[in-house]
Amino acid sequence: VFAVDAGRQMCEPVAGLPRIDRAVSAMLLTAWVALKLGDRVALHAFDSRPRIASGVVSGMPAFANLQRLAAAIEYSGEETNYTFALTTLAARLTRRSMIVLFTEFTDLTSADFMVRAAARIVGTHLLLVVVLRDEELERIADATPATADDVTRAVTAAALLRDRKLVLTRLQHLGVHVIEAEHDRVGERLVAGYVDLKRRNLL
């Protein structure tokens, strides 16, 4: 089950494209592989509330319908409601499933809601969270400062990256699988992660 966060943070650009566009591309690639391997697939999209719910599909002919649904995911300026979205999604599932959550967080408050929502479902379902590396923040944190403003920016960037790592570590401690990938490698990383989890028979 692919759960795509379409909230405000996912509409921010990474290397010229909104995060959500990169997430949808990775989702479609992995969905194609899953259908090819004979698995059943569903697509959900949400922001402050659920927006799209495909139901479970199987077989390669279903891929075209997933593409149409993915194209209908709209950019949203609303904050993501993880609790509502993931609780609603979990209630629709009648068996243990792999949930692939594409999301983004920039503050500890929203991240805490995500972690709490994840904790509620990770005992029942296999949860894989996919985020894009913030390469711009990494560049700022690693750059040699030339001015006082550069120092301030570097310190701020380093603090944000520490917070980010803390959140991802909390998720992993809950038993959530995490992929943090470069924007141009997220599709291949997700396919590899999906195939690995399937090979390990964790479902």
Which functions belong to the PLM regions below?
Residues 1-203:
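Exposed, interaction-prone extracellular/peripheral surfaces
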